[in-house]
């Protein structure tokens, strides 16, 4: 038994020595003899104790190294902070610029609200109107020109009704219109212009001396008022004088509307544009007239002369639309046999459904009703009485001529 134990102890000793070498311990005789004396279980506990002790020693040996690393890290942080401080110092100007930008932004918003937008707008509008008003104030030379024109007009009107004088008055009124058109108060300027235009037409038709005298008196008062411009009260006085003058002119007799021609108690309008026969009837009806119906040889000669003088093909109110070959006027009356002499040679021939009559050259011709031609409207002239009561009453309104 003793012999067998010895080799086993030797083997155990060798094993323990190998394990201790693996853990970094040096072999000693005392430890080896101690291991040989101890059992296998206590040996494991001893090994664990030595292992823990060795690990603790290793950690303790590393502490100075960790402190050194921390110090290096702090030095690096310090250097970074130093560099950052220098960089921040360079950014001070930029931050100030940013601050200025923000201040300007706030100032812009504040100025946008000062003092009250509505009041600023109102002030702007008032200044704009004031500028326009000042720009329209008449120059003294213009006022003097108006005064001179009215003085001349007064003398000219007193010498009516010579035709040359009427023409001269027309030219003077045209110049007066341009001068008055520069006065302030634009709406009243326009009204003055329109009134002077109507006055021009009325003066051109004046035959009665009493009416001339009335206009002379009105113009005399107007001259006195214009001579004292540009005071606003005087301008108002001129406006009132022109209003009175308008009333006087409206009481004058106008047998025919403007741009119509008077002949034997009727008014005639010769168009400046072309329409077909049916549309020509409509155009005349719109102004209280009808496509011309010829009632006498004198009227025929007058109208034929008007048409041939302008070298136009012009519709009249005659057709055979209701029954081929039976010619009838638009008022329903038949064509009298005595009027058949006015047809041109070989007419009417009804070539290609020609059912409407026209003035052509020195006579009449039939043509297609859908062709566009000039036309003539006819209506009765207004009666002009010399009775004073009739003279003082306003003339009936006359419609404008049809679209030319």
UniProtKB/Swiss-Prot annotation:
Designated name of the protein: CD209 antigen
Pfam families in alphabetical order: Lectin_C
More about this protein: In vitro, is a receptor for HIV-1 and transmits HIV-1 either in trans without DC infection, or in cis following a DC infection to permissive T-cells to induce a robust infection. Bound HIV-1 remains infectious over a prolonged period of time and it is proposed that bound HIV-1 is not degraded but protected in non-lysosomal acidic organelles within the DCs close to the cell membrane thus contributing to the HIV-1 infectious potential during transport by DCs from the periphery to lymphoid organs.
Region (7 X approximate tandem repeats): 96-257
Species: Homo sapiens
InterPro entries: C-type_lectin-like, C-type_lectin-like/link_sf, C-type_lectin/snaclec_domain, C-type_lectin_CS, CD209-like_CTLD, CTDL_fold
Quaternary structure and partners: Homotetramer. Interacts with C1QBP; the interaction is indicative for a C1q:C1QBP:CD209 signaling complex. Interacts with ICAM2 and ICAM3 by binding to mannose-like carbohydrates. Interacts (via C-type lectin domain) with CEACAM1 (via Lewis X moieties); this interaction is regulated by the glycosylation pattern of CEACAM1 on cell types and regulates contact between dendritic cells and neutrophils. (Microbial infection) Interacts with HIV-1 and HIV-2 gp120.
UniProt keyword Transit peptide present: no
Swiss-Prot/TrEMBL domain comment: The tandem repeat domain, also called neck domain, mediates oligomerization.
PANTHER family for this protein: MANNOSE, PHOSPHOLIPASE, LECTIN RECEPTOR RELATED
Annotated effect of mutating residue 324 to A: Loss of binding to ICAM3 and HIV-1 gp120
Binding site for Ca(2+): 347, 349, 351, 354, 365-366
């Amino acid at each position: 038994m003793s012999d067998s134990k010895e080799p086993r102890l030797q083997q155990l000793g060798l094993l323990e020595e190998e394990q201790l070498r693996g853990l970094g311990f040096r072999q000693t005789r005392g430890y080896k003899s101690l291991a040989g004396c101890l059992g296998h279980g206590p040996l494991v506990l001893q090994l664990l104790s030595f292992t823990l002790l060795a690990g603790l020693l290793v950690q303790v040996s590393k502490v100075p190294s960790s402190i050194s690393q921390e110090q290096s890290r702090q030095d690096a942080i310090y250097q970074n902070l130093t560099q950052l401080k220098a960089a921040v110092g360079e950014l001070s100007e930029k931050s100030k610029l940013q601050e200025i930008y923000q201040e300007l932004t706030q100032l812009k918003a504040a100025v946008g609200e000062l003092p009250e937008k509505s009041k600023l707008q109102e002030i702007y509008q008032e200044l704009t109107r004031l500028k326009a008003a000042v720009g329209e104030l008449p120059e003294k030379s213009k006022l003097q020109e108006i005064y001179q024109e009215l003085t001349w007009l007064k003398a000219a009107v007193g010498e009516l009704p010579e035709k040359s004088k009427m023409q001269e008055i027309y030219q003077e009124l045209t110049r007066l219109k341009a001068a008055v058109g520069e006065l302030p108060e634009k709406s009243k300027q326009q009204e003055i212009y329109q009134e002077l235009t109507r006055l021009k037409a009325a003066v051109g038709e004046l035959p009665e001396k009493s009416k001339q005298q009335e206009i002379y008196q009105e113009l005399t008062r107007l001259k006195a008022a214009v001579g004292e411009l540009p005071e606003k009260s005087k301008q108002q006085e001129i406006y009132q004088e022109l209003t009175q003058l308008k009333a006087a002119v409206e009481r004058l007799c106008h047998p025919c509307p403007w741009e119509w021609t008077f002949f034997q108690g009727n008014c005639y309008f010769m168009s400046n544009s072309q329409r077909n026969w049916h549309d020509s009837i409509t155009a005349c009806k719109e102004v209280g007239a009808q496509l011309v119906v010829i009632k006498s040889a004198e009227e025929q000669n007058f109208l034929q002369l008007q048409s041939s003088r302008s070298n136009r093909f012009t519709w009249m109110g005659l057709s055979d639309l209701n029954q081929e070959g039976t010619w009838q006027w638009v008022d329903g009356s038949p064509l009298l046999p005595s009027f058949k002499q006015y047809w041109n040679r070989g007419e009417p021939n009804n070539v290609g459904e020609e059912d409407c009559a026209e003035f052509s050259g020195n006579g009449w011709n039939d043509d297609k009703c859908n062709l566009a031609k000039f036309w003539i409207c006819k209506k009765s002239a207004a009666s002009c009485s010399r009775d004073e009561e009739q003279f003082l009453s306003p003339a009936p309104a006359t419609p404008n001529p049809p679209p030319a």
